[in-house]
């Protein structure tokens, strides 16, 4: 009999409601190396003290409920409960604070992002005592990290498979995203790959619709890959979207891709779900396929500053669940992404050990204990004039993906691909020569235009295009 059970047996069960903070607010608690640590941005209802709100978050996301229950006496709450161990005010906000919560590792199933999120970002987000709640960051202990396979292959293995080193990889999303027949779709893939891109991509919306069934798309894209490889002497790939309505159908598509001999498949990991994603990731490792991840639906979860979950948490979850690439914003394009915040979660995707750095939104030091890294993909509203900034911001271990910035070229898809490849090679060469891409970027692109008419035409088309709106998500 546990001490807690013994005590309750002596004094009798006392029904009723008591303040959460009496049990779940423990400012003297010393966190353990095995604890999962969470940083929540909490906005309580008027009149709810910070300690009570923070304790409520810890309780409702672990062992607690709204009233005392007699079965508390059948276990050891001290062993299993979440604890709010620190509260810190948010600068510039009157009624908002960061609540730090520690969760014992035994609360979570091994190797399951699904189970971890069911607790930590579950019903507590609808709790009436809170006006808003946002999960800003998680510290995943190395004891839990080691229960996950992680990315199917990782950055170095991908480079070795592709035999491409010393520069970012280049991609393109085929447009229009919906409506093309499989044969015309395959033609666009071929033209882009022949022009110098490393990858082309299914849009996240492309699954298996009446205008283009998945099997037809896979066949025509495989033909485009092999033909462009034969012409260029480079290894090419197309992200074949295996996302489907069931896990069984998803795996059937991945199996067909492997039988075609293509190097990479794709999954929409948030709409598809973490269970499906982890299943596909395991299949890809076992069968030599790279896995590209799209984050469709992320902004529903992460864009509001006061409620939801920050993308850095979704990025960590993806690294655990498995994926070799993931879309991570561009900083300079059409999609949301403040520079320091973006670089923060890019570090969390790629690096093995990341120190706490609040200037980048990183609340905890994270040790991935050699879990393979994920390549960030910059995609969304980018074109050749952005190439110097993208090369400088993201570095070599990245994919720079131009959809409209390739297919919108006035001379066609292949010249659009040529323009992007020339711009990239010019930026990499200039960087390697010691030139400052941030300061000299436009001059570097203009110099390259002199010996690439394709690049010159692209620069003329997009010279006025800018997406200058303030980021919603700031530190």
UniProtKB/Swiss-Prot annotation:
Residues with the N6,N6,N6-trimethyllysine modification: 14
Main location: plastid
GO biological process: photorespiration; reductive pentose-phosphate cycle
Family, as annotated: Belongs to the RuBisCO large chain family. Type I subfamily.
EC number, UniProt record: 4.1.1.39
Modified residues (N6-carboxylysine): 201
Protein location: Plastid, Chloroplast
Role according to the record: RuBisCO catalyzes two reactions: the carboxylation of D-ribulose 1,5-bisphosphate, the primary event in carbon dioxide fixation, as well as the oxidative fragmentation of the pentose substrate in the photorespiration process. Both reactions occur simultaneously and in competition at the same active site. Binds to abscisic acid (ABA); only half of the possible binding sites are occupied in the crystal and there are indications this is a low affinity site.
GO MF annotations in UniProt: magnesium ion binding; monooxygenase activity; ribulose-bisphosphate carboxylase activity
Domain of life of the native organism: Eukaryota
Pro-peptide positions on chain: 1-2
Name this protein carries in UniProt: Ribulose bisphosphate carboxylase large chain
Keywords: Acetylation, Calvin cycle, Carbon dioxide fixation, Chloroplast, Disulfide bond, Lyase, Magnesium, Metal-binding, Methylation, Monooxygenase, Oxidoreductase, Photorespiration, Photosynthesis, Plastid
Binding site for Mg(2+): 201, 203-204
Post-translational modification: The disulfide bond which can form in the large chain dimeric partners within the hexadecamer appears to be associated with oxidative stress and protein turnover.
Positions where N-acetylproline occurs in the chain: 3
Source lineage: Eukaryota, Viridiplantae, Streptophyta, Embryophyta, Tracheophyta
Source organism (scientific name): Pisum sativum (Garden pea)
Catalytic reaction equation(s): 2 (2R)-3-phosphoglycerate + 2 H(+) = D-ribulose 1,5-bisphosphate + CO2 + H2O; D-ribulose 1,5-bisphosphate + O2 = 2-phosphoglycolate + (2R)-3-phosphoglycerate + 2 H(+)
Active site: 175 (proton acceptor), 294 (proton acceptor)
CC annotations in GO: chloroplast
PROSITE patterns linked: RUBISCO_LARGE (PS00157)
């Amino acid at each position: 009999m546990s001490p807690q059970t013994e005590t309750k047996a002596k004094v009798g069960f006392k029904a009723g409601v008591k303040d959460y903070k009496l049990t779940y607010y423990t400012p003297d608690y010393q966190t353990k190396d095995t604890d999962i640590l969470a940083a929540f941005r909490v906005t309580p209802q008027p009149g709810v003290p910070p300690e009570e709100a923070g304790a409520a978050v810890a309780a409702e996301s672990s062992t607690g409920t709204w009233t005392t229950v007699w079965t508390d006496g059948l276990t050891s709450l001290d062993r299993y409960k979440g604890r709010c161990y620190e509260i810190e005010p948010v600068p510039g906000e009157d009624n908002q604070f960061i609540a730090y919560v520690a969760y014992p590792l035994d609360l979570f199933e091994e190797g399951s992002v699904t189970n971890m999120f069911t607790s930590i970002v579950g019903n507590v987000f609808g709790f009436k005592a809170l006006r808003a709640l946002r999960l800003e960051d998680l510290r995943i202990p190395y004891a839990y990290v080691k229960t996950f396979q992680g990315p199917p292959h990782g950055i170095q293995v991908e480079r070795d498979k592709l035999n491409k080193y010393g520069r970012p990889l280049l991609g393109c999303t085929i447009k229009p995203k919906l409506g093309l027949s499989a044969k015309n779709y395959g033609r666009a893939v071929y033209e882009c790959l022949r022009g110098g891109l490393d990858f082309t991509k299914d849009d996240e919306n492309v699954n298996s619709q009446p205008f283009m069934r998945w099997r037809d798309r896979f066949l025509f894209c495989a033909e485009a890959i092999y033909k462009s490889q034969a012409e260029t002497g480079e290894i090419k790939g197309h992200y074949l979207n295996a996302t489907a309505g069931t896990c069984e159908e998803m795996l059937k598509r991945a199996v067909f891709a492997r039988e075609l001999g293509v190097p990479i498949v794709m999954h929409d990991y948030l709409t598809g779900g973490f269970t499906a994603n982890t299943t596909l990731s395991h299949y890809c490792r076992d069968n030599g396929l790279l896995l590209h991840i799209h984050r469709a639906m992320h902004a529903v979860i992460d864009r509001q500053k006061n409620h939801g979950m920050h993308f850095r948490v979704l990025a960590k979850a993806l690294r655990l669940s498995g994926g070799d690439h993931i879309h991570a914003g561009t900083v300079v394009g059409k999609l949301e992404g403040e520079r320091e915040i973006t670089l923060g979660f890019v570090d969390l995707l790629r690096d093995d050990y990341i120190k706490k750095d609040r200037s980048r939104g990183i609340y905890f030091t994270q040790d991935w204990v050699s879990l393979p890294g994920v390549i960030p993909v910059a995609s969304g509203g980018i074109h050749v004039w952005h190439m110097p900034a993208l090369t400088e911001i993201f570095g070599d271990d990245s994919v720079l993906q131009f959809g409209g910035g390739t297919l919108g070229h006035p001379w066609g898809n292949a010249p659009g691909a040529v323009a992007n490849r020339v711009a990239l090679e010019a930026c990499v060469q200039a960087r390697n020569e010691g030139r400052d891409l941030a300061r000299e970027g436009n001059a570097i692109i203009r110099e390259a235009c002199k010996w690439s008419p394709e690049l010159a035409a692209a620069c003329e088309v997009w010279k006025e295009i800018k997406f200058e709106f303030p980021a919603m998500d700031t530190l």
